[in-house]
From Swiss-Prot:
Listed GO biological process terms: DNA recombination; DNA repair
Protein name: Recombination protein RecR
Function: May play a role in DNA repair. It seems to be involved in an RecBC-independent recombinational process of DNA repair. It may act with RecF and RecO.
A Pfam family matched in the record: RecR_HhH
Organism field: Legionella pneumophila (strain Corby)
Keyword terms: DNA damage, DNA recombination, DNA repair, Metal-binding, Zinc, Zinc-finger
Residues in Toprim domain copies: 77-172
Amino acid sequence: MDALSRLVEALRCLPGVGPKSAQRMVFHLLQHQRQRGLHLASCLEQAMKHISHCQQCNNYTEQTLCTLCQNPNRDSTLLCVVESPADVSAIEQSNSFQGKYFVLMGKISPLDGLGPDDIGLPKLKELIIREKIQEVILALSPSVESQTTIHFIHQLLKDETVNISQLAHGIPSGGELEFLDGNTISSALKNRAVINV
């Protein structure tokens, strides 16, 4: 396989990029944006080498702890649990939450072989106890897997003195947090509901 074909194939690993889109990107870079293409390659290499997960919340960072976990001005008694770093970014862009985060890196899905340990629920419980969290906001996209995950988290924390709430309605069923506008996220956070199981 030649360099052109390898690059087209490599770009297809991105979500929503099929063979035609990948080919258009490659031709555009080669014909009009060679310097930017080299810059893109350099940025990708640096990101893949240096970005890892925050030891406390699992968000992306180049350090041991991410900037959100290091920030002393954030409310350390309030913890927002999300599925992915993209959800952290979406909530931060809404400017409606000043607490800390915990990124599950997925949700419980037996069909995909993901159980409570695979998404970090024991680490979540340890964090809640260690940091004396008073409220956990479950900000998971509405789906069957999310409801299963919410149930497991509630069971995991049933003996702890912590309030558990989840985002209010307004987030469409099957919708992903990262694609919602800031007003919808802000409204869902403000109108979150306590979970009674």
